[in-house]
Amino acid sequence: MFPFGPHSPGGDGSAGAGAEEPTPHEGQAAATGPPSPLHPGADATHPPPPARSPRRPGAPSLSPAPRSGELGLPGAPESSTASAPGEPSPPSPPCRRPGPDCRAKSRGRHGLGAGLGGPGARLFGWLKERSLGRGLFVDPARDNFRTMTSLYGSIHPADSVYLSTRTHGAVFNLEYSPDGSVLTVACEQTEVLLFDPISSKHIKTLSEAHEDCVNNIRFLDNRLFATCSDDTTIALWDLRKLNTKVCTLHGHTSWVKNIEYDTNTRLLVTSGFDGNVIIWDTNRYTEDGCPHKKFFHTRFLMRMRLTPDCSKMLISTSSGYLLILHDLDLTKSLEVGSYPILRARRTTSSSDLTTSSSSSGPRVSGSPCHHSDSNSSEKHMSRASQREGVSPRNSLEVVTPEVLGESDHGNCITSLQLHPKGWATLLRCSSNSDDEECTCVYEFQEGAPVRPVSPRCSLRLTHYIEEANVGRGYIKELCFSPDGRMISSPHGYGIRLLGFDKQCSELVDCLPKEASPLRVIRSLYSHNDVVLTTKFSPTHCQIASGCLSGRVSLYQPKF
């Protein structure tokens, strides 16, 4: 396992019996001075050493010192280098502590090494490399990341499935099952398709899954998944019984655009163009539906996401605002409807923030009037929590993300994704005139402040890139890779793989002081129409993309 000689850690000390190393008897015979009066177990105290005069590096000592690499043996007589009683002892070379892989039996009578060029030096070199974080013994995933980067760098279009626009329409969303065994396709013409991503074989078509466009698909586990549609409903499905729906959920009054799921509480969270965020208790679902409650309301709602640990909820709007609910508690908010406003950043005026009395939550609007619930929510903030420096639960932050090169205030945030480890958020923004598009990465700063107004924003722009301005009026869904090191973004008639640097490092390892461009790792073009959605497989080195003309393409490494 280790490229060492017979004295490597874990090796047998007897295997090196023929090596030319001094034995304890030879070392003892070489000693010329009287033995030290101190012996193991003696209770004596060394006097404090006096100030030493400076000595040139490498100057010879008064008595021969042991060779580099030799360690003293317990119970062996002291050499002549020991000073007489009452005299200060010269400083001894520091003893290096053996690593955890060194076993006691390998420390036999030869010690750990016998010189600078012996196996001991190689051992200490290996320990140094390991302490610096190099090699598989510290972080095996580092080499795995290098391998994945190499694989994605050699990725090519592997297969494609053409879906007739007459029967299926455009591809609006793609979603893999958590185990990567099923790829689901949300189609424009009321259908959901299921494929085997490994063989590219069609498994099942859920004809008339909805009565209008299917917008989003979300897996709850390896067998249950949910779909939402412009028909204002959400449907639950079971992969083991696809002939009928598990149940249909009614509660929205307009197009339902995306679905989130809290695995800890088993609560389903949906959002739609009616401005409502609704929570569904899937623990008590029946054929007629399941209990639900309006959790939040805001105007111009586009997308809603939960962080991986479900500690934050992010909501993007077509007016350029990003709403962040900190210290999220979905279960508590079913009874408590107060949302203290922590801060408003880069808003046009203080009157832009109002609270909807029907949902007891603040919303962004152009109305100059305030509802009384906004002031009452601040009164409900615990004074004790303010004194102790603790933010209230479900506290709201309103942010206008900084976009480099924006010509006018207020960009439409059309797509919203979160880093798999919750470090950052990924936004795709378009200008008000719809003539510019860009992808931006924002790092989450420290937790939300306690004071209602703070000069610091919790999001910081770290990376950005300009996108192709094609397919106006359609939302382009981008995504992070499962490890969070790469981004797959629709780009014209294909996709681009983007990284934070050329080595595809993790975000925390390459955070710039100022916003810097994303690096293009690879560009892939295999469609004949505008790509609307793309997705990484959670288990395989595979990417899927879907376009406006109904074509689904799969990308895999090719050597």
From Swiss-Prot:
The residue ranges flagged as biased composition, category Low complexity, are: 56-86, 350-367
> What lineage does UniProt assign to this protein's organism?
Eukaryota, Metazoa, Chordata, Craniata, Vertebrata
Organism in which the protein naturally occurs:
Homo sapiens
GO cellular component labels: Cul4-RING E3 ubiquitin ligase complex; nucleoplasm
Residues with the Phosphoserine modification:
S53, S63, S89, S92, S349
Instruction: Cite the repeat ranges for WD.
Output: 166-205, 209-247, 251-290, 296-335, 408-448, 470-508, 526-559
UniProt keyword terms in alphabetical order: Methylation, Phosphoprotein, Repeat, Ubl conjugation pathway, WD repeat
Q: Which Pfam families match?
A: WD40
Q: Which residues carry this modification: Omega-N-methylarginine?
A: R134
Q: What's the protein here called?
A: DDB1- and CUL4-associated factor 10
Could you tell me what this protein does?
May function as a substrate receptor for CUL4-DDB1 E3 ubiquitin-protein ligase complex.
Q: How does it assemble?
A: Interacts with DDB1.
